[in-house]
Amino acid sequence: MTEDTETSSTGAGADDRTAAISRETAETTINVTLAVDGDGEATVDTGIGFFDHMLETFAKHGLFDLTVRCDGDLDIDDHHTVEDVGIVLGKSFNNALGEKRGIVRYADRSVPLDEAVATVIADISGRPHFEFSGSFSQPQIGGFTSDMARHFAYSFTMHSEITLHASIEGINAHHEVEALFKSLARTLDEATQLDPRRGDTPSTKGEL
């Protein structure tokens, strides 16, 4: 197996905010395609049922078209699979947004799920920074380690090059994680929208 290889492609311009990345390491082989301006359609196979469900939920609530295929070292644990999908999905977002001309840039959403609530605040800033508060109420959800939801968000943030603050509260880890993925999706959907009043990059520096 190749130690670490990656290939990527992006759409032709601002009207085609898409990306495709293939990445292979000694631990995972991943293929991701993303359309930011999609319909919420998803085809996901990571080998972790709950994680597949969360990625499908992410696509549905963010109205992103998403395919994720991952063959990871699940005989060890779920860490590399979840982490590396976060890395590749983050890179895909960054690539698909290109120069980020006309985007809203800032957004925040709180999403409840029964007793749980998650809040995500994002700045598509070009400056990767991640903050997280809260803890998950149970350590495991099926074959998914609950705290890997936090690590997924961290990996996504660092490689999409955004600033992201997230928090969760609740008493059921399934609800907490699902609320987090929905909140992340809704926030990114809003932050990546194109503002018809703006044709340039939303920064006094002129770039993000």
From Swiss-Prot:
GO CC annotation: cytoplasm
Main location: cytoplasm
Uppermost EC category: lyase
Source superkingdom: Archaea
Keywords from the UniProt entry: Amino-acid biosynthesis, Cytoplasm, Histidine biosynthesis, Lyase
EC number: 4.2.1.19
Pathway(s) where this gene product acts: Amino-acid biosynthesis; L-histidine biosynthesis; L-histidine from 5-phospho-alpha-D-ribose 1-diphosphate: step 6/9
Region Disordered, annotated ranges: 1-22
GO-annotated molecular function: imidazoleglycerol-phosphate dehydratase activity
One record GO biological process: L-histidine biosynthetic process
Catalytic activity annotation: D-erythro-1-(imidazol-4-yl)glycerol 3-phosphate = 3-(imidazol-4-yl)-2-oxopropyl phosphate + H2O
SUPFAM superfamilies given in the database record: Ribosomal protein S5 domain 2-like
Compartments (UniProt record): Cytoplasm
Protein family (similarity comment): Belongs to the imidazoleglycerol-phosphate dehydratase family.
PANTHER family: IMIDAZOLEGLYCEROL-PHOSPHATE DEHYDRATASE (PTHR23133:SF2), IMIDAZOLEGLYCEROL-PHOSPHATE DEHYDRATASE HIS7 (PTHR23133)
Protein name: Imidazoleglycerol-phosphate dehydratase
Organism expressing this protein natively: Haloquadratum walsbyi (strain DSM 16790 / HBSQ001)
